[in-house]
Amino acid sequence: MILYPSVDDLLKQVNSRYSLIMLASKRAHELDAGAAPMLSEYKSVKTIGRAMEEIAAGDLMIDPDETDKD
């Protein structure tokens, strides 16, 4: 269960729970692979939590061009 950032705060940045999970999991994999962090400080030690913090901060968003490919 995540406490910070809250799911409600995250859903203000991303339009659906499915999109939120896909975005966060892809970013977490990038962080695991050594991608540079977008924030200077994180509350979470896990990459999935860090990805969600980046989403909540507005630094990580879904590419609108990618959503039109379906």
From Swiss-Prot:
Question: Which GO molecular function annotations are given, in alphabetical order?
Answer: DNA binding; DNA-directed RNA polymerase activity
What's its catalytic activity? Answer: RNA(n) + a ribonucleoside 5'-triphosphate = RNA(n+1) + diphosphate
**Gene Ontology annotations of biological process type:** DNA-templated transcription
Q: Which Gene3D superfamilies match?
A: 3.90.940.10
Q: Supply the enzyme class, top level.
A: transferase
Could you tell me which Pfam families the record lists for this protein?
A: RNA_pol_Rpb6
Its cellular-component GO annotations read:
DNA-directed RNA polymerase complex
**Stretches of the chain forming a coiled coil according to its record:** none
Similarity field: Belongs to the RNA polymerase subunit omega family.
Question: HAMAP family, alphabetically?
Answer: RNApol_bact_RpoZ
Its assembly, as annotated, is:
The RNAP catalytic core consists of 2 alpha, 1 beta, 1 beta' and 1 omega subunit. When a sigma factor is associated with the core the holoenzyme is formed, which can initiate transcription.
Q: What does this protein do?
A: Promotes RNA polymerase assembly. Latches the N- and C-terminal regions of the beta' subunit thereby facilitating its interaction with the beta and alpha subunits.
Q: Which NCBIfam families match?
A: rpoZ
Name by which UniProt lists this protein = DNA-directed RNA polymerase subunit omega
Q: What organism is listed for this UniProt entry?
A: Lactiplantibacillus plantarum (strain ATCC BAA-793 / NCIMB 8826 / WCFS1) (Lactobacillus plantarum)
